[in-house]
Amino acid sequence: MGNPKAFLEIHRQEAGYRPIHDRIHDFGEVEQTLSTRERKLQASRCMDCGVPFCHWACPLGNKAPEWNHALYKGDFELAYQLLTSTNPFPEFTGRICPALCEKACVLNRFNHEPTTNREDECAIIEMAFQEGFIQPRTDIQRNGKKVAVIGAGPAGLATANDLNHMGFSVTVFEKNEAAGGLLRYGIPNFKLNKAIIDRRLRLMEAEGITFCYGKAINLENLDDLDNLEKDFDAVVISTGTPTARDLKAPGRELKGVHFALDLLSQQNRVLAGMEFSKEERVTAKGKDVLVIGGGDTGSDCIGTAHRQGCKSVTQIEIMPKPVEGPEDPQNPWPEWPRTLKTTSSHEEGCTRRWNINTLEFLGENGKLTGVKVQEIDWMPNPDGGRPIMVEKGKPEIIKAELVLLAMGFLKPEHPEYPKNVFVCGDAANGASLVVRAMASGRQTAQKVSSFLLG
């Protein structure tokens, strides 16, 4: 630890976002960057704690104290080596991870000014690319074993990357026209520029990984799986959670009611150069938009709606409003705090409401015009089970020409596969964070290696 008093003398400084009046007119990344000097000062605040709770909280087990120290000292190559010893794709997590490590940081308990780990790791990996530290590996020794990875989201990419470095010949099958999964087709460009994904894919291809696009493997068709097993020694299923949670309220069939990914994935494809007919296009332009669901996907819909030129945005959530402030007494540090989160998209403008139940979608001539909702309360269950929903007041109507359902995804069910077939990421565990999917992918790569090589 180079400066043991830095956390006392230097306050947390975030890079912040581009001005709202600028960023809502384009899909460029909203987050700014600090200067190298400022970034090194932020890294110096890391105390190299005796018990590094940041390491405990990170699903990847990132060595934040070690690479923060190297960053502070200006040894960017060492910082890069330490960072990538646990994290295969810091350029992804450095942009979109909620930074579980920061909430568990000892400084967060001390003064609610944790180290800026997420921004630090993004700075390290971008410096590594800029300085040429990252080059395709040419020392990989092949072991003669072949592995198929089905699905090129963060879990599949992490699995493929690790297996390839272990010497396996890896082929990735992806149903879409490009790799990335929700990194590419769910997360907006204003949070993650897709050129960042393409840069990593070029590196993986140069190191020997084969990608087959537009190739959907029907996991319910045993012939598809049998054919893969004939050609590969092991198969990894990393297909994510493709089924969004629906809302079966009356009027669901009206034109204008869509899943969140209908908007998000199409917008990302439009930015990539794909064209859609007027009938196919899902757009918020000139419309009153209602987002149902209070999570990150709903937030992404808000930011996208603003950039498309919506008239207004309202976000409703059936659960109570989270605690405001740095921590919730019900789940104390170092746990992840269940507190109110305000994103860059929320800052761009929206009405947020909690304890709102959706009753009915309303329309005229087959087109959505509004949504009937009901304010509710959650009361304790005398039997100790799930809280009881109690209606308050009278139903009301929220005007809307576009509704976006952002209520999460259903965990897929899988049959019992042969021993050489592995499942990882969201496909195995249900919808979660990109960092958890990557960690699952890395763990699965180790399981495959142990199975095939002993």
Tell me the role of every PLM-derived stretch.
Residues I24-L41, K63-R95, N111-D139:
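Ferredoxin-type iron-sulfur electron-transfer modules in oxidoreductases and energy-metabolism complexes
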Residues M1-R37, Q42, E121-G454:
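Residues forming the flavin
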Residues D48-K73, T93-I124, T171, A178, ...:
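Iron-sulfur cluster-binding cysteine motifs and their immediate structural context
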Residues R45-V51, P88-P90, N429-V434:
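Glycine-rich phosphate/pyrophosphate-binding beta-alpha loops
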Residues E9-R12, D48-F53, N87, K194-A195:
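A ubiquitous short alpha-helical element
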Residues C46-G50, E113-P114, R199, N365-K367:
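Short amphipathic alpha-helical segments with coiled-coil-like heptad repeat character
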